[in-house]
Amino acid sequence: MCSSDLLEKSKTDGDAPAVFDFSSWDPEPAGSHPDNASCYGVEDLVGNGWEWTSTPFAPFPGFRASVSYPEYSADFFDGEHFVMKGASPATARELVRPTFRNWFRPRYPYVYATFRCAR
């Protein structure tokens, strides 16, 4: 699987069509939105499903927990949760950006998730 850094580098900041913000309840076939391809020609990087990465969810250098919600991320820096990138059909438009990180445990069954292999 790709690392979180590799997927982020491949992302596009464009506002081209994708499947998020409940625009569809179901994923669409890969390649359905060619206008949303990154500058590297990689398609379907935002929307249609969170993409699993091989990167454990961990704090960035200088991380400080939010005063109003300290357990939001820190409780999940346990080596059992992995970074997910992109967005799913159920992701709100405000959260859709190349730098947003989500996280889940690999065996969690209730997430719109996809994965991508790279050489």
Give a label for each model feature:
Residues Y110-R119:
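Short, structured beta-strand segments at or near domain termini in extracellular proteins/domains
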Residues T99-F104:
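Long, intrinsically disordered, low-complexity Ser/Thr/Pro-rich regulatory/activation regions
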Residues S4-P98, P109:
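Functional-site microenvironments in short loops/helix caps that host divalent-cation chemistry
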